[in-house]
Amino acid sequence: MARRSQSSSQGDNPLAPGYLPPHYKEYYRLAVDALAEGGSEAYSRFLATEGAPDFLCPEELEHVSRHLRPPQYVTREPPEGSLLDVDMDGSSGTYWPVNSDQAVPELDLGWPLTFGFQGTEVTTLVQPPPPDSPSIKDEARRMIRSAQQVVAVVMDMFTDVDLLSEVLEAAARRVPVYILLDEMNAQHFLDMADKCRVNLQHVDFLRVRTVAGPTYYCRTGKSFKGHVKEKFLLVDCAVVMSGSYSFMWSFEKIHRSLAHVFQGELVSSFDEEFRILFAQSEPLVPSAAALARMDAYALAPYAGAGPLVGVPGVGAPTPFSFPKRAHLLFPPPREEGLGFPSFLDPDRHFLSAFRREEPPRMPGGALEPHAGLRPLSRRLEAEAGPAGELAGARGFFQARHLEMDAFKRHSFATEGAGAVENFAAARQVSRQTFLSHGDDFRFQTSHFHRDQLYQQQYQWDPQLTPARPQGLFEKLRGGRAGFADPDDFTLGAGPRFPELGPDGHQRLDYVPSSASREVRHGSDPAFAPGPRGLEPSGAPRPNLTQRFPCQAAARPGPDPAPEAEPERRGGPEGRAGLRRWRLASYLSGCHGEDGGDDGLPAPMEAEAYEDDVLAPGGRAPAGDLLPSAFRVPAAFPTKVPVPGPGSGGNGPEREGPEEPGLAKQDSFRSRLNPLVQRSSRLRSSLIFSTSQAEGAAGAAAATEKVQLLHKEQTVSETLGPGGEAVRSAASTKVAELLEKYKGPARDPGGGAGAITVASHSKAVVSQAWREEVAAPGAVGGERRSLESCLLDLRDSFAQQLHQEAERQPGAASLTAAQLLDTLGRSGSDRLPSRFLSAQSHSTSPQGLDSPLPLEGSGAHQVLHNESKGSPTSAYPERKGSPTPGFSTRRGSPTTGFIEQKGSPTSAYPERRGSPVPPVPERRSSPVPPVPERRGSLTLTISGESPKAGPAEEGPSGPMEVLRKGSLRLRQLLSPKGERRMEDEGGFPVPQENGQPESPRRLSLGQGDSTEAATEERGPRARLSSATANALYSSNLRDDTKAILEQISAHGQKHRAVPAPSPGPTHNSPELGRPPAAGVLAPDMSDKDKCSAIFRSDSLGTQGRLSRTLPASAEERDRLLRRMESMRKEKRVYSRFEVFCKKEEASSPGAGEGPAEEGTRDSKVGKFVPKILGTFKSKK
């Protein structure tokens, strides 16, 4: 078929607007035929005859005349067995003779495949260059030096020795170099190589071929070809330089030229053009003389550092006289038997006298290449000898290549068994990987299968590495996970080149911008692979005081097993639980600050925070922010008690709990740590910083849960049969009741709630506690156990009140003794015996030498140890407990923890380095004056039986009142505002006043002991941060949080005002006396009395650490109204407004009996502060 130039009008529509008339003229063809047959004279005669102008210049006439070739007759090279052609004129009669059936040459060294481009960029370069621009030659050299995959050159004339040196350098780096030269000017390139003494036949990564211009065929069969005027340099199929610049000295110095540097999609056209030209190319065949000279170069010995040193008649060095790299262009002798020329090893003759020639030896053979280099490995194994060493001189050559890696500045190049790692290949792989990400030239690429072949086949020659700065490789080593630490590299432990997949392809190993454990595996340790805390060598958990991983904290015992993330539990039960959690966080934030006892629903276990703020991955467990109904508490090991000689001695057991370990901090009252904020999605909205004002108080937060446990245990203690102290216990049934109670107040019945996760979780942790009693425990984990037990006891008491109220709807009253007896009988055998062996020993309150009867089967009861200034909490053990009891009297035959005298520790002793200050001794150090709180309804241990008169005088309320009151009971038990003070008077104190030993019974005391004050001085700030904790963990909108923050700040101002302190209460003889008959208000209902009994501990010691209740009900109402006005219709949970309005409407009737439910709800929340004020006035 005719070419486009021979039928220029084909397919054109003459009526089209852009129609271009054909330019072909017949006399052009006839004139050229005349020129080919008769010469220039015949050409001139034909033009004169036709009357046409001359269309060929003298140079063109000379070119046609010089390169005209006669047709190739068949008789000259007759094929074997073919007949002779009788037509001897050779004329084809056509313009398109027979197509060639020869095979197309392949890009045998490989060719990158482009998959996409990122934009297009064109840069124009001129020669001579402007002052602020690089020259075209310098840019070409820079491009060749940056080549990693291929260098393709199409040039009409290549005689620049500097560019030849750059090309050979690239070939020495195993970068394929393809050079297509004009067929007519290729001899000049051979002459240049001859002058530089370069044997082109021995350069493995260099392919030089020739391309001719299009062939023009005449009528008689004669033909001539043109020149190749295409000039471009293609590097890695990513960047192209094209223009009028030729690789000649004259173009650098005297000619003006223009060149463009293309990046992006424009490169694809050059890529295609080069492959087309290469398919039409012919091999470069030097002349016979040139071949003879090249062979002489190959056999001539290399003598000297200069290229022409030792050559007779030559005294000046050539442009390649580089001292170290002269042999690049002048190969050494061939008698070494090398498979490829030694010029590929630039350092072969450099410091050769100081180099070992033996190959490195390693277990399993000479080399252990990666799976991606299997073709090379098979070839090396074929060449290896029986002993696994590479045979012949080639083995020494490879060994020297590997050894020279030790000279390079790779910090872990030679770690392991010798210099086996080939970081030259690693750098090559890394550069290719980064190029595939588009870091340098903004393109993506992968290797063609032939490219894989040469990359794998020659991967083990380290000296073919680029001489450029190793910026890409440094980026790889610095940030990518492909190259791990040197410690992770062991022989046979896995591939050393992670970027290379098993099939040799580049495997992308993308690492996110934040490669921390929580980003890859989520914020919950249960979904992360391999918790370190469960392993024997696992690092201990960090906390807020450990800013860096190097600040390790000793933790005696394994970390708890990770639990499933509660937020991911699907189903309506999980959704309802999360909803109740959000409501609880809202209420705890709204009303815990100032309106803690305004009748609003209380925070649902908002204080149940973990002491260890950060999980093994540097974040808090997601379940810590949830109420216990949605947590599955993990089992924590305990401290096993050891026998000791006495109670007050300095036994070795005391040193165990005081080992430096996890510093206890309040979870959110201290400065927020970014690691904490990353712990979960729900904690990411912590926007308040109101807790900063309580930094000093937050330091004492470590023993808060101990105080809570003391208070709860003391309340639930009562007299059992035989005169022994029987203590109530929590159980899984209590957990079920708690879950029913935890439901919103819209379920007044509350008696048939569905069993939720709480029952299962509490049963699990109870069983785990029983199993781990004897295990050597971690003191850091015991605080969490106390917290869960506290929740159990508190919930059990609340639900027992509810059940008693429903079983006895017509009862006139519920005395404190009746309630406590019921609690003690209901679940006395269900508690795990964890705390019997957990921390301390119980103390008999009557004498120093009278041992306390060991009672119960593992109740979580807490008694203060008062043996000679040892203000430590005690856990008395019941009869039948699987663990030894705890008796701390001198001469006590029972085993127990031996507390040091004056040891300022609570039941959970503070660790060294803990931010919690030590608690001063009870009798050896002065204590700030504490109000005696006669009316605080504090339950203290006394030798006398309580007077039940005031509790029995109240009128009986209707059943509905009791039901609704029980739903609000938790609010009264642990409101936010009061929990800040619960630890102040919460420790039941066995008196050491010399009272006769008698069966101990809980009674309504007029005040707290001094020990309770001193014990709780350090732990007291734990509960003080409850409101801020709930605010921080709330899941509300930002506008509501801003309102709550203001109210919280206002509440802190109130807390900063110290309460009046009537006088010191050191060893007051009134501490153990029961209250008078009229202590309780006569108009209190049964529910209020029960609530007051249960809350007695939390309402005491108001002056401790400058904590007081809000000033008055009017102040709280004012704050609530202020909050409502600030919302401006931005209600988050409108259902809670009902409670606020109820309290506003019913606040005046605090001293009256229960008349209606709305009024009753209001009274429940406001009785206790008024009663407290009454008691204070009586004091």
Swiss-Prot record:
GO cellular component, one term: cytoskeleton
Biased composition annotated in UniProt, kind: Polar residues: 836-847, 884-906
Membrane-crossing segments per the record: none
Top-rank lineage group of the source organism: Eukaryota
Region spans: Disordered: 484-577, 636-669, 830-1026, 1047-1084, 1143-1165
Residue segments, region Mediates interaction with CSNK1A1 and is required for FAM83H activity in keratin cytoskeleton organization: 1-286
Key words of the record: Amelogenesis imperfecta, Biomineralization, Cytoplasm, Cytoskeleton, Disease variant, Phosphoprotein
Quaternary structure (record): Directly interacts (via DUF1669) with casein kinase isoforms CSNK1A1, CSNK1A1L, CSNK1D and CSNK1E. Interaction with CSNK1A1 recruits CSNK1A1 to keratin filaments. Interacts with KRT18 and probably other keratins.
Protein name: Protein FAM83H
Native source organism of the sequence: Homo sapiens
Species classification: Eukaryota, Metazoa, Chordata, Craniata, Vertebrata
Gene giving rise to this polypeptide: FAM83H
